[in-house]
């Protein structure tokens, strides 16, 4: 007998910005100081936070005090093994002495100058060494900015304004990419789900330029290109969807998409904001054996210091400074750039990634064994360094697959994990991020606490679960 969880959930849009307050869980850890600060913060900050994704509900939003290695402490003194890591940036761990020493040296240089420094070239050379598609590089401050630049470049080069995104992908919060396809009330017999803005204030006119396709369906992409290819300038894809359970494009799909883009003069933009320098030294492009026209990086690039990059083929990148504008006051701040230089050196020249991947494989095996012993259907998707946990035997290959089974069981399990000192994202679509500092003690403790939290969750759900024989 295998337990399969099916539930009638709440609108996926509610989880889009981390709003988990509807899933009330008894807190057996003290959050008094976080709750007090939340009420104070509400007087000056919308939702009491400075990013919507940090709001976890009125009584569940926590505030960090400090972090070190793979662990984080909140202001109430609760200690967690952290598998969020700021949504992936801290790939070596919090407060890595090697990177922080480099950052302090960068601080002594002066900060920002409205001039360039020699280090910019050395970091660009490192990126080009690690990622063959990165013939030329321009730096930004965030993944959102890097994707903005890539889309602008693609439109400038092709002279075509329309673009394609993949359902379930995430590319930041600027107007052109802040769209999704809600599936709660979608009827497949009525055609594709409606393309919807993630927020009020995004002009509906933008939708006239946007096309969305399901992942891993090259035929759909080909049909779209044949019909509208003369107007489409860019295909924007996150091959491992970091905000959708790490659902991953197949190698064949990526190679097919690469060829279709070539045939129809569409620029292939690969968003590696989360996968870059994490799943391999050369990112998802190395894993899958293909080269983007343009690609974007951030997250792991600076081990938590704010820095990003857009990179790509020289013929596209040379448009910058000629016909395409790009810049920013804080771009290549001396602290962030020094941190990136050291982080990339470590990732390129040491076994850090192998250490992370080994930990991730052992974590999957341990968690999988615990779930299997209880007859709970499950699968892992993505990469060991950023695993998505899916409560079904068959892993999803598209966003539509993910949405077929609601995630209320995960959404009940996650707060119990928090109670037991394991910090994962309340939103089931965010993967478990790992860092080099996660060690054997972290693994042993994680598996013990995962098992205990799982037992509590199963007990609390009781008759809400349905048993399906497979």
Go through each PLM region and give its residues.
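Conserved N-terminal phosphate-binding loop of PLP-dependent enzymes in the Aspartate aminotransferase
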Residues: 27-470
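Short, Lys/Arg-enriched N-terminal segments with co-localized hydrophobic residues
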Residues: 16-26
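Aromatic (phenylalanine/tyrosine) cluster motif
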Residues: 5-7, 17
């Amino acid at each position: 007998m295998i337990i399969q969880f099916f539930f009638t959930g709440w609108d996926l849009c509610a989880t889009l910005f981390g709003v988990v307050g509807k899933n009330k869980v008894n807190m057996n850890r003290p959050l008094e100081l976080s709750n007090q600060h939340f009420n104070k913060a509400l007087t000056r900050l919308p939702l009491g936070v400075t990013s919507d994704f940090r709001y976890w509900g009125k009584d569940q939003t926590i505030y960090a005090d400090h972090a070190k290695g793979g662990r984080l402490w909140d202001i109430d003194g609760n200690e967690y093994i952290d598998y969020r890591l700021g949504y992936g940036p801290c790939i070596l761990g919090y407060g890595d002495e090697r990177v922080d020493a480099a950052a302090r040296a960068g601080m002594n240089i002066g900060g920002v100058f409205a001039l360039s420094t020699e280090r910019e070239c050395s970091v660009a050379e490192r990126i080009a060494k690690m990622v063959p598609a990165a013939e030329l590089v321009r730096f930004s401050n965030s993944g959102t900015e890097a994707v903005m630049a890539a889309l602008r470049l693609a439109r400038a080069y092709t002279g075509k304004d329309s673009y394609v995104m993949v359902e379930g992908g995430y590319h930041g919060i600027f107007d052109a990419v802040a769209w999704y396809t809600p599936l709660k009330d979608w009827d497949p017999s009525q055609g594709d789900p409606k393309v919807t803005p993630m927020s009020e204030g995004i002009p509906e006119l933008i939708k006239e330029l946007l096309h969305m396709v399901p992942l891993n369906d090259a035929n759909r992409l080909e049909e779209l290109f044949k019909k509208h290819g003369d107007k489409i300038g860019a295909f924007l894809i996150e091959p491992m969807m970091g905000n959708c359970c790490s659902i991953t494009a197949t190698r064949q799909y990526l190679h097919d998409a690469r060829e279709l883009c070539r045939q129809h003069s569409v620029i292939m933009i690969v968003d590696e904001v989360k996968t870059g320098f994490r799943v391999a030294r050369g990112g998802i492009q190395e894993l899958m054996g293909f080269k983007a026209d343009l690609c974007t990086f951030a997250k792991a690039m600076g081990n938590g210091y704010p820095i990003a990059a857009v990179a790509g083929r020289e013929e596209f990148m040379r448009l910058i400074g000629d016909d395409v504008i790009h810049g920013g006051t804080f771009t290549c701040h001396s602290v962030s750039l020094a941190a990136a230089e050291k982080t990339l050196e470590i990732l390129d020249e040491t076994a850090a990634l192998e250490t992370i991947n080994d930990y991730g494989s052992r974590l999957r095996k341990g968690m999988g064994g615990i779930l299997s012993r209880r007859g709970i259907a499950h699968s892992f998707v993505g990469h060991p360094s950023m695993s998505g946990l899916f409560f079904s035997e068959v892993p999803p290959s598209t966003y539509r697959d993910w949405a077929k089974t609601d995630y209320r069981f995960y959404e009940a399990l996650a707060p119990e994990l928090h109670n037991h000192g394991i910090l994962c994202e309340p939103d089931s679509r965010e993967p478990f991020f790992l860092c080099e500092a996660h060690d054997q003690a972290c693994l042993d403790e994680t598996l013990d606490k995962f098992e205990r939290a799982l037992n509590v969750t199963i007990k609390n759900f009781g008759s809400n679960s349905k048993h399906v024989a497979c």
